[in-house]
Structure formats: structure tokens, C-alpha cells
């Protein structure tokens, strides 16, 4: 869950949203305080990587199936030892180059890996009428400077973005909200909640390295303030004011957003 009207902007910029992949998953608990998930998955497609979204579009496919010439593994561990606090760590590793339907097993791309490595730590604190969440994501792409030159990216009729792709990307953010209705007995007894929240995040989808051209506009800081009103447990009405800060050569981007969401799936 998240307080903002839209998904956390940094993670939604560089990583696939609602990331579903074909594969095998094992999960379970160790005692009462530990939870684990281990997955063996189809790899991403480097042809769909781009400057503004890093690997985000690599999980999508133009077909009703996903080519799986390359594979990936993912691991997540959560700890619940402290009441009200969840601490999580996760990692992903997989190859992405030459993972398409029309692959050339004897071509130059077959000699490249395009290894995607992602590490993440996150936490949620939900106690004393406060909810505090934070996360840090860091990603690395092997053979990044060669992804732009892959066969199929530079032709005029190519459906893929011809822009360069960064070797590294980063997204981090923290948000905190306090339930105002916890101080109003009648509304609290009626299970209504009104969280007043603030959020800060920093992200960069293209951290240029080596001889790569620099694009400073991809580095952004963002703040948001707003409310989440729960008339009933599963329904939330959200409103926020946000301000995106870019480098001095670019205009900052303020915005106002309103939304209604159903959270029953995540309960």
C-alpha cells in the first residue's frame, strides 16, 4: 500500500508495476517472525529497456506469451520480530539480452548477457496511529552500453526505443501518515480513518557512465503532502499536492491529484 494517489513514483519509473512473470515460486514461514519467497522466472527483454524507464518495460510482451530464452531468480525475506514493524530485503538477478522471439543464437547478441541485478530494502511501521513506510532500490545492468546497439533497436521501423540505457538506476523514498480520527472517539469507534501524510522520494532512471551521453532531467526529487480518508475499511479517498524538483535547466513540476481506490485485494 501507499499514501499517494499514484504508485510510488521512483519505483514505478524504473521497475515494472504489478510485475507478473511466468515461473515457479516457493514461499513460507520460518517460525513466527520470518517469511521468505524464492522464485525462478523468465528473464526480461533488453530490447524494451529505455532511458526514461530503465528496465520497466522489459517484462511486457507483444505476444500472449513470454519468450524465456533467458532466466532469472528472485528472493525476498521479511522479518516481523518487532511489534508493528516489518523489515524486508529482496534481490533479483537475471539475463536479458537475446531474450526475444526472433533471437539469433549465432549472432553478436548471443555473446552478451545483459545481466540485471536489483537489490532492495524496505520497511513498514504501523502502530500508535502512525504508518511509516520506506524503501531503497538500486539496480545494475551489465552490457548497458551495448543494449542501445542491439539488432532491432536502431531501424526506422523498429517498435523499440533507440535511446541509450543506463548501467545503474536508483529509487528511494519515505512516507509517514498519522490518523487524525484516532483522536475523535465517535469516528474512531466507527472505524473511520483520516491519515494526514507527507512523502519524499529521489530517483534517477539514467545514471550515465563511461562515454554515455548525460541526460540530467532523469534525476528527480519529489515531495508530496495530502490525506487518505477511509469511510470504510476497503475504500480510500486520496488527495495530494506534489512538487517534482528537476535540475536548474528544467522546469519544476507541481501537481494536484485526487483518487478513489479499493484496497480489499491487499488486506
Where are these regions (language model features)?
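Surface-exposed coil loops of outer-membrane beta-barrel proteins
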Residues: 1-78, 95-108
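Charged, low-complexity intrinsically disordered terminal segments
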Residues: 78-79, 88
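Outer-membrane beta-barrel pore domains
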Residues: 84, 88-267
